Amino acid sequence: MKRLPSLLTICLLLTALAATRSLSQTPEKRVLSLDDLAAIRHVSDPQVSPEGNWVAYTVRTLDMKEDKRNSHIWMTSWDGSRSVQLTSSKDSETTPRWSPDGQYLAFLSGRGDEGEIDQLWLMNRAGGEAQRITELKGGVNDFVWSPDSKRLALVVKDPDPDAPDPKDKDKEKKTAKPIVIDRFQFKQDEIGYLDNRRQHLYLLDLATRKAEALTPGNYDELQPSWSPDGSTIAFVSKRGPDPDRSDNYDIYLIETKVSAAARQLTTFKGADSDPDWESSLAWSPDGKSIAYIQGGASELIYYAVHQLAVIPAAGGQTRLLASSLDRNMTRPSWSADGASLYFVLEDNRSEHLARVPASGGSIERVVGGQRVVGAFDVNPTGKLAFLSSTPNEPAEVFALDAREPRRLTRQNDELVAKLKLSAIEEISFKSKDGTAINGFVVKPPDYQSGKRYPTILRIHGGPVSQFDNSFFFEWQMLAARGYVVVAANPRGSSGRGQAFSKAIWADWGNKDAQDVLAAVDYAVAQGIADPSRLGVGGWSYGGMLTNYTIAQDTRFKAACSGASISNILAGYGTDQYIREYEAELGTPWSNPAAWMKVSFPFLHADRIVTPTLFLCGDKDFNVPLLNSEQMYQALRSLGRDTQLVIYPGQFHEITKPTYQRDRLARYLGWYDKYLMPRPDGESGSPARNSR
């Protein structure tokens, strides 16, 4: 008689069989392709519910079929076990905000609006469809709940009295009125020509759905923040005889009733809570203090370090809580007990979640390491959720438990699990004058030690920004193609203090160019880069520094210069940087030598021999198209290999998905043509190089 196997034996056999089958069915990892651009899910804006059981957040994706970006609101349970998509309309939804009583989740959307203007919507947690709450002609740009959940403060732009009715079928046939300009700064990217319409605060009564203007006048009012007792709103405004001529933002207070007069709280001659600096106003839980981010003196423009500050709400002296640390700080938020302040601390190649006692003292890096912490939220019970990205993981939402990060969302896990991503290595080296410079090197996934690879130097924009330990699709794409990517943070970058950033003051294309060239020298010396197959490229200031670099070094066989300028004289009055130009360079007629000095890539275009691809959006008011046109024309006149690609309807940021893909494909096509030519002599078009 045969002996039957035991239940344990059967279970073990079945487990082994399942494991074998699982292993045999596990797909082999592949390198990243251009098609994966549309698969990345961009997670942002975590918001913890008042009771702490849920975290709302947004997910942005690219819809290649409809050729648009979509943003929808999701929610994850605090333990991370459940993830729910809350909105799924054909239009986007952003800015989820819980009402303090937990009954509603408000958000912004242009749903059903012919002009695609954002309005305020409410979703009742008890169930039912979201409802549109406002129908304001100027739309809603921002909002914040009152502590009692009965009102909301809105940021609303004055409507354009000359704007055509979106429902008018003949609006395209009507002649537009002339544009009349009388402002000092009269252009801004994504907005266009600036008129005298402003953004104002409105009070919305939730019961009556009536919105009334709280701050009429000739100034913009931004970043509203309610006092804990609901009696006062703090906001930021730039006032004075001609606000366009400085970045001197100040904090004001106003009672929450129509016709109340605003009272100025800060008087620092620089930016208090600059709206362009990921800042906001944060009342202490007891209502006695307001935390914010203070910039440097106005004359330092964007080179100044931004510091965490606290001021008494009743008025008084501002205190800088971490002035001993020469680093940028953003996103101030009080702890639930008011004893300390959380903020994001930018450091060398990373951004960390930090905390400092409200009375001042030592800074604690609550979440550190080789990562980039982004937006975060602390709810009234002290629960904290934050965004975190690493070089091999796009941003996801994490919870902070006992000072340890715990992951809540896994929006990109399925994609990342399929990919053979390149490791990102931190590097440090010396520039020509001995200055220590930091950066990254990215090697192909199947990199072989001892073999030299075609190498591309990528340069970041800014200039006061940095390459950091976050996920860069572009780096992974180039590495997957077989390139080594070298990315440096030259002088002018952020992350290493004000003096390091200001080292290029009125001296663009000199020290910073030497620093990025030293990165290439490092890669060659390490036996990684093939010195005969070098490429370079960047966008915005990265494109500018590309032009500076190829105008003084002929080693590069291919360059991609995006949204760049070389003839700085051409920027005066044609882009949005008039205030910064005059602060740093003076005026062209009072200091022509300074302007000529930084315009040398155009004035000495004959020194450029590198085949160069120029790219730009035709509606870019940040670094307008005319600058790319000039450089293209100069190189074309000299008989150099060059090409100009113009993206219709695009601003400084290329947002249309098919254009995003096209740009990356053209990078690959251009670099391949000169750095990895095929045996048949064909260069490869974007279509042929799309994977």
Where are these regions (language model features)?
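Cap/lid segment of the alpha/beta-hydrolase catalytic domain
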Residues: D165, P241, S298, R403, ...
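Mature N-terminal segment immediately following signal peptide/propeptide cleavage
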Residues: T26-D67, S71, L201
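Active-site-proximal cap/loop segments of hydrolase catalytic domains
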Residues: F472, A487-R691
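Short, solvent-exposed loop/turn segments at conserved positions within beta-propeller repeat blades
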Residues: K65-N70, G112-D118, G192-R198, P243-Y249, ...
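Predominantly five- to eight-bladed beta-propeller fold
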Residues: R69-S71, K157-L204, N248-D250, V305-L308, ...
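Short loop/turn segments that connect beta-strands within beta-propeller blades
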Residues: S77-S81, N124-G128, D205-R209, E255-S259, ...
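Conserved beta-propeller blade repeats
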Residues: R41-A56, K90-L108, E129-A130, E135-L152, ...
